[in-house]
Amino acid sequence: MAVYCSENFSVYPQPSLHPPGAAAAAAAAAAAAAAAAASSGQRAGGYALGDYGAPANAGYLWGMNSPAPYLQGPPGSGAAASPFLPPASYGCSRGGQLVGSPSGPGSPSAGGAELSWLSLASQEELLKLVRPPYSYSALIAMAIQSAPERKLTLSHIYQYVAENFPFYKRSKAGWQNSIRHNLSLNDCFRKVPRDEDDPGKGNYWTLDPNCEKMFDNGNFRRKRKRRSEPNTPATTAAASSLGGLKAEEERPIPASGKPCGNSPPPELDPSPSARDHPKSSSPSGIISSTPSCLSTFFSGMSSLSGGGSRLTGGLSTDLHHRNFSAGQLSGGTFTPSSSSSQEVPSPEQLQRVAGPSPAYYSSFHPSSGSQGAQYNHYYNFTVNSLIYTRDGTEV
């Protein structure tokens, strides 16, 4: 009988393909069983699995050599053994074509060609073709741990691997070289010299006690360094770098993002004690004790406005003799006026040329109040000297 596989890989028998020899043997066995039941006064119960013998032991499938207990005949029945059902996993193919048939005594295709991978006598022959799922380091560790003294020579390690794993019996040159490399490069294996009273050749290899936990069920697992381990160089370096970053964050940052290059001289600083005051530990203390560049500039201008009364006389006389004038402010260009009259530009002209006027210009404008006439010349000089400079003038 041949076995086919359907598209979904299900095995089913084909009753129309029973060999004639098997059908005749089955009919003879059924007739003999019926005659024995009639002679003993019992009624024949029809065909049952117990009426058929076990299939002959065939060497075409490993692990299936023992006959199934439910296919054996009753003891002392004397039924002829004939192949009834082939193994369910034999002869499957995707296309539905016949791959092979059991080579039993009654099979017509006993001498047919079979696949080479199906001709396996035992599980050991199958293991010769399958590589074990262990690394070379794991194989070495298993060999060392199996020794009574927990140490082996290189030749003994080779012997252990070859005896316990049939896959490595075929080609010895490749894996033996890998064993030597792993012994030399892996820190878990240590070389122990021989004793003087121990004859032989080669040193012993032993396993580091700290690495025994790395080999879990034959799988070599490297131990990863924990981040929480104290007093390690990596932890110390990380702590120092974090301390440097924290110190950088505590430094005050100017509001404009640029260093205070235009800060007033020390004599114009209204509060020099603020610079010498120690920094507070809280962020609010850092912000309050360290003024920004803009606040420093405003404080300098306020100090200039407070001390402007002392400079009014000298500046007014000097400006009167030099005959400065505001001139015409149009289109961003300066045209000196030929007249000696001092013209004060309107606020609209100042806003068009220099943008929105800052707060520190309001105290010098003529329309600011009672001090307008006093700072008339000083205001004109300040605006013109900041925006338009005349060649050859010295202030």
From Swiss-Prot:
Gene Ontology BP annotations: anatomical structure morphogenesis; cell differentiation; otic placode development; regulation of transcription by RNA polymerase II
Tissue: Initially expressed in the pre-placodal ectoderm surrounding the neural plate, which will give rise to all craniofacial sensory organs. Expression then becomes restricted to a region immediately anterior to the first pair of somites that will give rise to the otic and epibranchial placodes, before becoming down-regulated from this region and restricted to the ectoderm and endoderm of the pharyngeal arches.
GO molecular function: DNA-binding transcription factor activity, RNA polymerase II-specific; RNA polymerase II cis-regulatory region sequence-specific DNA binding
Listed PROSITE patterns: FORK_HEAD_1, FORK_HEAD_2, FORK_HEAD_3
Keywords on record: Developmental protein, DNA-binding, Nucleus, Transcription, Transcription regulation
Pfam families (alphabetical): Forkhead
GO cellular component: nucleus
Alphabetized InterPro entries for the sequence: Fork_head_dom, FOX_domain-containing, TF_fork_head_CS_1, TF_fork_head_CS_2, WH-like_DNA-bd_sf, WH_DNA-bd_sf
Motif Nuclear localization signal, residue range(s) on this chain: 221-227
Composition bias type Polar residues, residue spans: 325-335
The keyword Protease appears for this protein: no
Compositionally skewed regions (Low complexity) per UniProt: 234-245, 336-349
DNA-binding region of this protein: 131-225
Domain of life: Eukaryota
Compartments where found: Nucleus
Region (Disordered): 216-288, 322-370
Keyword DNA-binding set for record: yes
Annotated function: Transcription factor required for pharyngeal arch development, which is involved in otic placode development.
PANTHER family assigned to the protein according to its UniProt record, in alphabetical order: FORKHEAD BOX PROTEIN, FORKHEAD BOX PROTEIN I3
Protein name: Forkhead box protein I3
The gene coding this protein: FOXI3
